[in-house]
Amino acid sequence: MKKTIPIHKECHMNTRCSHFQTCPITTFHKIISGKWKILILWYLTNKPLRFSELKRKLPDVTQKMLTNQLRSLEEDGLVLRKVYPVVPPKVEYSLSDIGKEIIPLLESMYNYGVMYTENINKNKDKLKLAD
């Protein structure tokens, strides 16, 4: 049986819901919105990473943007920042306990991406055969 997701009766695509500020979807959107946040969270699912390691995995992100996105994820409680008292300075980023709760969602997004890509490629092949 398909699970029904509760929606406030005031929620419609063309009107603003009176529960907008407390809506779980609004909250979730707020914490993961950002061009690089989902990828940062994805890369942190396996192990803590240093800033430079994240930067290498995300070559198109600027240093300033990566710093801002990490800071935002830290402020929202999804990412922990650990500073080691060594010279040169060493800082590692990892998922917090609440951040680890997002791993199943990221895995679902990954699986959806695989399925979507396979379907798009199949449809492209069918279109090529029709030409």
Regions found by a protein language model. Name each.
Residues 33, 44-45, 88, 103, ...:
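Amphipathic, positively biased hydrophobic alpha-helical segments used for protein targeting
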Residues 74-94:
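Beta-hairpin "wing" of winged helix-turn-helix
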Residues 69:
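Residues within the DNA-recognition helix of helix-turn-helix
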Residues 47, 61, 73, 113-116:
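The DNA-recognition helices of helix-turn-helix-type DNA-binding domains
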Residues 19-65, 85, 92:
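N-terminal helix-turn-helix DNA-binding core of bacterial DNA-binding proteins
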Residues 1-22, 75, 80, 97-131:
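C-terminal regulatory/oligomerization modules of transcriptional regulators
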